[in-house]
């Protein structure tokens, strides 16, 4: 069977792998306002400015109503901002004609929370669907489908229907389908929310493989900080339509600046006592301090000095985490004994790190 110039052969598709560069995404002063029939207005996005570099994995995190999903709809052209610019590889897509948007969407893969598979199609049939829409030659389609199923670890599941697959396998089919047309941008909207922890870990491992081997830019929308911790290079924290905090995963996890970021980080790290634990700790003798641990915090030297002066240091909570090849942690300690030595311990560490006393 012959192939037209617009229909890549399996060899041509293989030659395109892996992608050498993902899509660059830029939000410039993006605002989105929704109006209902009674003229009431809701600001879903409020002057969002954010850049996602090619090949980067960014986690966009926030509670329900923060504006995360609205961002996704803008990226794939399903909605338009009220004001601002949205650039994909330097091209502003705001106001772009639908014919051009359709072409743009072919370069964007999408995976969903509820998988969105066709129940009447096999796993292979689901992966093949976007290739049919793209009018790819049948032989090339079949080869590409098998290639993608093998890539996601389902090479022997092509003939299975969705009802015969586990949740994790369904999401793998969804990922294979999203990758079928060789996109350079992948949008993952709460892609692991419906999965158990072990399956979530497996799917995140697969997404890391996608980014590592194919060079695809990945935008992960989630309300789970553990997902961001596992996969992202950068994180943007959203609240009430605004990006309230942005930085590397290490920066945000080790030193969250906003209250909402602090709450999210606490759910993933659990290295500070919660209110109930604090109340229990406060029921015992001594002063309680939570201390940020870094290479320059001076914690161990201060502990040794306190012990020499008759203060006893007892570690009651905490942990150390390594992210992006850097370590950080928090330690909660109870000090008893010489009151002057305890105060010196506290004052010394205020000069070298962040130390907070836990009180009622």
Curated annotation (Swiss-Prot):
PROSITE patterns: ABC_TRANSPORTER_1 (PS00211), ABC_TRANSPORTER_2 (PS50893), METN (PS51264)
Stretches assigned to the ABC transporter domain: 25-265
Record key words, sorted: Amino-acid transport, ATP-binding, Cell membrane, Membrane, Nucleotide-binding, Translocase, Transport
Region (Disordered) location: 1-22
Binding site residues for ATP: 62-69
Assigned EC number: 7.4.2.11
Quaternary context: The complex is composed of two ATP-binding proteins (MetN), two transmembrane proteins (MetI) and a solute-binding protein (MetQ).
Protein family membership: Belongs to the ABC transporter superfamily. Methionine importer (TC 3.A.1.24) family.
Name of the featured protein: Methionine import ATP-binding protein MetN
């Amino acid at each position: 069977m012959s192939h037209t110039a617009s229909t890549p052969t399996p060899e041509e598709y293989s030659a395109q792998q892996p992608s050498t560069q993902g899509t660059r995404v830029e939000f410039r002063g993006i605002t989105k306002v929704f109006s209902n029939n009674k003229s009431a207005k809701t600001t879903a996005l409020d002057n969002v400015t954010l850049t996602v570099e090619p090949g980067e994995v960014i986690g966009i995190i926030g509670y329900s109503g923060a504006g995360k999903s609205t961002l996704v709809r803008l990226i794939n052209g399903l909605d338009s901002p009220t004001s601002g610019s949205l650039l994909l590889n330097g091209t502003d897509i705001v106001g772009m004609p639908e014919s051009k948007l359709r072409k743009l969407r072919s370069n964007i893969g999408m995976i969903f929370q509820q998988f969105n598979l066709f129940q009447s199609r096999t796993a292979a049939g689901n992966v093949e669907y976007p290739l049919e829409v793209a009018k790819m030659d049948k032989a090339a389609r079949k080869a590409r489908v098998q290639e993608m199923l093998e890539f996601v670890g389902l090479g022997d599941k092509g003939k299975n229907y969705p009802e015969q697959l586990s949740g994790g396998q369904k999401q793998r089919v969804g990922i294979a389908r999203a990758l079928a047309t060789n996109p350079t941008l992948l949008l993952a909207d709460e892609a692991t929310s419906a999965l158990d922890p072990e399956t979530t870990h497996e799917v995140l491992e697969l997404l890391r493989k996608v980014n590592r081997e194919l060079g695809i830019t990945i935008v992960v929308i989630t309300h789970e900080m553990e997902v961001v911790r596992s996969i992202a290079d950068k994180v943007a924290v959203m609240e009430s339509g605004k990006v309230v905090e942005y930085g590397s995963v290490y920066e945000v996890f080790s030193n969250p600046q906003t209250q909402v970021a602090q709450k999210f980080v606490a759910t993933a790290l659990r290295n500070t006592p919660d209110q109930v634990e604090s109340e229990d700790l406060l029921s015992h003798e001594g002063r309680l301090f939570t201390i940020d641990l870094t290479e320059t915090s001076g914690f161990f030297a201060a502990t040794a000095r306190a012990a020499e002066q008759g203060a006893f240091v007892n570690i009651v909570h905490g942990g150390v985490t390594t992210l992006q090849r850097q370590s950080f942690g928090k330690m909660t300690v109870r000090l008893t004994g010489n009151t002057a030595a305890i105060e010196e311990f506290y004052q010394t560490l205020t000069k070298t790190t962040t130390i907070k006393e836990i009180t009622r």
